[in-house]
Amino acid sequence: MPKISIRGTEMPASPIRKLAPLAEAAKQRGIQVFHLNIGQPDLPTPEVAFQAIRNIDRKILEYSPSQGYRSYREKLVGYYEKYHISLTADDIIVTSGGSEAVLFAFMACLNPGDEIIVPEPAYANYMAFAISAGAKIRTIATTIEEGFSLPKVEKFEELINERTRAILICNPNNPTGYLYTRREMNQIRDLVKKYDLFLFSDEVYREFIYTGSPYISACHLEGIEQNVVLIDSVSKRYSECGIRIGALITKNQEIREAVMKFCQARLSPPLIGQIAAEASLDADADYLRDTYDEYVERRKCLIDGLNRIPGVYSPIPMGAFYTVAKLPVDDSDKFCAWCLAEFDYERQTVFMAPASGFYTTPGAGRNEVRIAYVLKKEDLTRALTVLERALEAYPGRTE
């Protein structure tokens, strides 16, 4: 029998989804599972999106242009202008989710063997996309003790060599919820200029910043306009993960032309998804305001609750809707699997993402988990109770 490819063997399993079979088995046993593992918002999608879908009046559901509909891209120009990001419709390429934007950015900008510097912990799929592109992730450590702030510039420069081609950031950050400061963004800008690197900036959580600190986009950084590739998606801000609409944005025409070759090879981004996403830009201002307020309350509920559990510590996330928490366990992979396979409290259990999957450094994140606060406060409160009982019962507890 033929063997699968080396690429297929090296592709990492998702730390967010790899325990899903255990969760499904628990449900089959009648256990209620609180899903804290995945960034799937439970808040309603804007009604205008559903109205647009219901009002589709077409005889054919045709291919859309490979770059995405111009009407949608022109409307996005106005959206970004609200964040002081000046674009034209030609700067925007509509993609099948933010994930495709990351993959196409890698494919267009990196050669096999090229290296990308990424602060860790990092969104696990970045590693998968790098493998797909034949590139290599080089991680720079951030720690829970330091609130996941960036290390000094010298630590970055220790990693830079002749194969280094890019720095990748997620701001606000998934999985940590960290928000980069102006000083940190300027530090990254200076490195990009000094070593002539690409800067890939995943900014899908810009609506969710809780500190009062300003949102600093990579597109705000002067002097590196041709180096920046911005990644975006409607999945989180409008609870539209399933329509698979994202965007790759750059002022670099050479990058856009290369990306368009990959876009043409995959033919077109989703037609119906673009219709829904374009309509969502007309959602009432109260929609995003109410969504923001809800996440502020959920964040407080979760972080206060976690830090009341003996042996548990979580920093206060400044953005997105995740936190990385340290638990008093020997191994978070084992603990998360145990919660689903061997534990329940009053017929309930919790599904969390082991943080080790967000690191490439061996042993890092071994006693950490990522938790998404995408459940209503009543469910979060109950999930915290279940987690506390699980930690009390877990055989591998360390404190």
Locations of the language-model features?
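PLP-dependent class I/II
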Residues: 2-4, 8-14, 19-56, 86-399
